[in-house]
Structure formats: structure tokens, C-alpha cells
């Protein structure tokens, strides 16, 4: 089975304060160990969003880059989508409903029968965005990326 894992810094393997351990601790490595007969394709990009447009680094928008990711890795049996945390940043004026629509857009694109006409449509697993806790307001960097609305929308998604 070929499993394409599309995600953000969590898929990329970000570990606070321990960048040297990034490659060995990311969840895709654990998945590969649990499924040694499968091919795990890691597509993690720090800062990647579902639909939010990052004006500084535009290639971080998932819906814009999804076609390239899908076409470059066919055939794929399963796509795991683990995105959404970055869409909750205050600069994007986050809304849980908008985030849910973005995930639906991802799913529709992956299920598009014209995407890869000679291959079957892959199964899809959506992993909920990482739940933001109150501590993020105190621990974030000087950019102040998350605010109270970010926390509210994260809680709404968790329900």
C-alpha cells in the first residue's frame, strides 16, 4: 500500500527545541515502523495551511499545491490529511466552518476521477488539527500568531 501523508510542521517533524531529533521522531516514521510492508510518502511542510493564503510564502497553501502533490506521487492507495492548525493563526481570521469547507475541498479534489484517470481513487483519512491549548498564547514567539479567536475555533473543531 502507498500512503501519502500531507501535513504541516507536525508531519515535517517539528520538535520544540530538538531539531536534531526531527527525522527520527516524526509520526510518519512511527507509521513506517508499524507498517513495514507499506510505502509511506512524507509530504510535511512547516507552515502549510489548508486554504489560507500566506502572502510571504504562497506555496504553503495546501489547496494550491495539492494537485502537484497528488500527480507527483500516483498511484496512491491512501491519503492522510493532517492540516488545519496553521489556518487558525490570527492573520487568517480563522473560522472553523471555513476550515471544514477547506477540508471538503481537499477531499473533493482527491476524489476527482479525472485527476489520475488510469488509477483508482485513493481512500482518505482526515486527522483533526492539533487542538490548541491556552498555553499557546503564553508560549508563542514574538509574532503572536494565535489569539483568543484561534483558541475558540480550535475548541469548536474538537467538538
Each PLM stretch: what is its role?
Residues 1-46, 51-56, 69-71, 79, ...:
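Serine-esterase "nucleophile elbow" of acetyl-processing enzymes
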Residues 60-159:
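Alpha-helical cap/lid subdomain in secreted, periplasmic
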Amino acid at each position: 500500500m502507498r500512503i501519502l501523508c500531507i501535513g504541516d510542521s507536525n508531519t515535517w517533524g517539528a520538535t520544540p527545541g530538538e531539531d536534531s531529533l526531527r527525522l527520527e521522531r516524526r509520526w510518519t516514521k512511527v507509521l513506517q515502523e508499524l507498517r513495514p510492508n507499506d510505502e509511506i510518502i512524507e509530504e510535511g511542510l512547516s507552515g502549510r495551511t489548508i486554504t489560507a493564503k500566506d502572502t510571504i510564502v504562497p506555496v504553503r497553501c495546501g489547496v494550491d499545491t495539492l494537485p502537484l502533490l497528488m500527480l507527483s506521487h500516483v498511484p496512491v492507495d491512501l491519503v492522510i490529511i493532517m492540516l488545519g492548525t496553521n489556518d487558525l493563526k490570527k492573520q487568517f481570521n480563522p473560522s472553523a466552518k471555513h476550515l471544514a469547507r477547506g477540508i471538503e475541498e481537499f477531499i473533493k479534489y482527491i476524489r476527482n476521477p479525472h485527476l489520475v484517470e488510469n488509477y483508482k481513487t485513493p481512500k482518505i483519512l482526515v486527522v483533526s488539527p492539533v487542538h490548541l491549548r491556552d498555553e499557546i498564547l503564553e508560549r508563542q514567539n514574538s509574532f503572536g500568531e494565535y489569539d483568543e479567536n484561534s483558541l475558540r475555533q480550535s475548541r469548536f473543531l474538537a467538538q
